[in-house]
Amino acid sequence: MFWTVPVTLALASGASAHVAAFVKGMYCEGGPDPNNYNPNSNTPVNPLWDLPFEQWWMQADRGCNKAPPPDGASVALPAGGQFTVELAHNQAQTTLSFNGQFAGEWPDGQPHPENWSGPGSPPDCIQDDGAMHTNNQTMAAGTAWAISYNDDISKVTMDNLVVFSVLEHTPWKRIATYDVPKDLPACPAGGCYCAWLWVPNGCGEPNMYMANYRCHVTNTTSTKQLAQAKPPTWCGGDSSKCTKGAKQMIAWNQATGNNVQVPNGASPGYNINMGWAPGAQNDIFA
């Protein structure tokens, strides 16, 4: 379908908007229907809440697991290096659509102060963009990437999908850069499966996010293998109580398939409270 840029683009925003990582190599680029490419799609950003495993896993509830990246695109993960994605509420607010004309410094494409925060002291939740699900940058829960060494996504499981990179205090600005472990080995010929992950810390419904990507590792000579992933545990920053080594993604507040328990009033996240230090996770190997 041919798209023209409308004078006023109706973007998902406010209470109806959320956040996902946009990059070439993502599933559901342009929406779930490969025959009807939508540059204004927000399909990957919608949260997962109280769903059976078969529906929340890989965003099967919206068909994203069956909408692979167009043109065989894949996210490059340089071993020991970094890769960059765009955190946004809508594909139109990224450089993937409309030549990036609606992309700004922030995920909603709008201007905000550098010290953006909610009202009051201490700050309440940010009111002018509830999709951020935070009070300010320091309270943003953190986002993560996980990888499975399977080119057939039907073979990806919680046990072989390993969190390999964590970016603290995100989502925040649109541009987000993640560190890659130096010992990640090469992927199979058909590539690997990756997931972008986020569990907000309050400021809205206690849901979670999981988006799908084809990915491949570059600049590597490593022959190491990933260890089997174990469920993370709440340790509240006490390293002696944390799960060590390779960890599964967080599955929380779903109808089935949950793998974590946290104290009343707490939220699990991709941060030190669940045993993840920021940056590349270099302890994930067998």
Curated annotation (Swiss-Prot):
Gene designation per UniProt: AA14A
Residues making up the signal peptide according to the UniProt record: 1-17
Family: Belongs to the polysaccharide monooxygenase AA14 family.
A cellular component term, taken from the record's GO annotations: extracellular region
One GO MF term: monooxygenase activity
Subcellular location, principal: secreted
Uppermost EC category: oxidoreductase
Documented EC number(s): 1.14.99.-
Compartments it resides in: Secreted
Cofactor note: Binds 1 copper ion per subunit.
UniProt-annotated glycosylation sites, renumbered to this chain: 115, 136, 219
Record protein name field: AA14 family lytic polysaccharide monooxygenase A
Organism: Hypocrea jecorina (strain QM6a) (Trichoderma reesei)
Positions of disulphide bridges: 187-192, 194-215, 235-242
Keyword Glycoprotein recorded: yes
Keywords linked to the UniProt accession: Copper, Disulfide bond, Glycoprotein, Metal-binding, Monooxygenase, Oxidoreductase, Secreted, Signal
Cited InterPro entries: LPMO_AA14
Pfam families, A to Z: LPMO_AA14 (PF22810)
